[in-house]
A protein has these predicted regions:
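Conserved glycine-rich Rossmann-like NAD(P)H-binding loop of the short-chain dehydrogenase/reductase
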Residues: 37-54
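Conserved NAD(P)H cofactor-binding loop of Rossmann-fold oxidoreductase domains
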Residues: 101-107
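Rossmann-fold cofactor-recognition segment
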Residues: 61-77
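Conserved glycine-rich cofactor-binding loop
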Residues: 16, 23-25
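Substrate-binding pocket helix/loop in short-chain dehydrogenase/reductase
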Residues: 84, 109-111, 118-120
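C-terminal helical subdomain
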Residues: 191-196, 203, 211-251
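Catalytic loop of short-chain dehydrogenase/reductase
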Residues: 104, 142, 148-173, 178-187, ...
């Protein structure tokens, strides 16, 4: 997979792309990057002040029309999912992309010591919300020229790791969800489904999981942008591989 080519600014003009967890970390950098290339990003987050901040940054630098969706994914249910779908439907001609990026770590703990409340919160935020958003938002993608659903993965999705608890389990389940959607959606629609493992990246979640690690030794989240541009480009149309892992030579 070679990403060493230039994307033309504006190639995402008039595309409407939802980014969950858009107010910080990887989601924030991806939202800014997609806006730079012309996308009207639907900014999801939990904190209104953080959403207002990235909204203001986008409209001050780019000629795009972002939308704010404030929602705690831990509390997302079918009624709220329908409400989000209605807001997007009323404000866009169609939905071109869903980037399921938002996630929480919960805590680093053995299974024996894991409390049920944290367990459920992690699974609700990382897994169940993705199921609900895909269920209610994919109908809005019918008229998109090149619709994409992108899940954010992790190394613990493919191999369980001690003390990663509910987070690892949620990511393994998300990987399975993406594979199921690939088989269910791709033969019947233009939708392509990808699962992307960004690797070790300088984020607050990474700092919490690895407190002794030097953050300056990690790549910045902005270095992931080329992958997301590729997902939405025609170059990904005939790609057979759907589980993509970060490779430094492509950034």
């Amino acid at each position: 997979m070679n990403l060493n080519f230039e994307f033309e600014e504006g190639f995402l003009d008039k595309k409407h792309i939802l980014v969950t967890g858009a107010s910080k970390g990887i989601g924030r950098e991806i939202a800014l990057g997609l806006s730079k290339f012309g996308a009207n990003v639907i900014l999801h987050g939990r904190r209104e002040d953080a959403l207002d901040e990235i909204y203001d940054e986008i409209v001050s630098h780019y000629k795009t029309d972002p939308i704010i969706i404030k929602c705690d994914l831990n509390l997302l249910d079918e009624d709220k999912s329908k409400e989000i779908a209605e807001v997007i439907s009323k404000n866009t001609p169609c939905l071109d992309g869903i980037i399921n990026n938002a996630a929480i770590l919960g805590k680093m703990s053995s299974i024996a010591d894991f409390d049920l409340g944290t367990w459920q919160k992690v699974l609700n935020t990382n897994l169940t919300s993705s199921f609900l958003l895909v269920k209610y938002l994919t109908p809005l993608m019918e008229n998109s020229e090149r619709p994409r659903i992108i899940f954010t993965s992790s190394g613990v999705a493919t191999k369980g790791k001690a003390f990663w608890g509910a987070y690892a389990i949620s990511k393994a389940a998300v990987k399975s969800l993406s594979e199921i959607l690939q088989e269910e959606l791709e033969p019947l629609s233009k939708i392509k489904v990808f699962n992307f493992d960004p690797g070790a990246t300088r984020t607050s979640m990474r700092a919490y999981a690895y407190p002794a690690e030097d953050p300056s030794s990690l790549k910045d989240a902005s270095s992931l942008l080329n992958y997301y541009l590729w997902f939405f480009s025609a170059k990904s149309e005939n790609k057979d591989i759907r589980y993509i892992q970060y490779n430094a030579s492509n950034s």
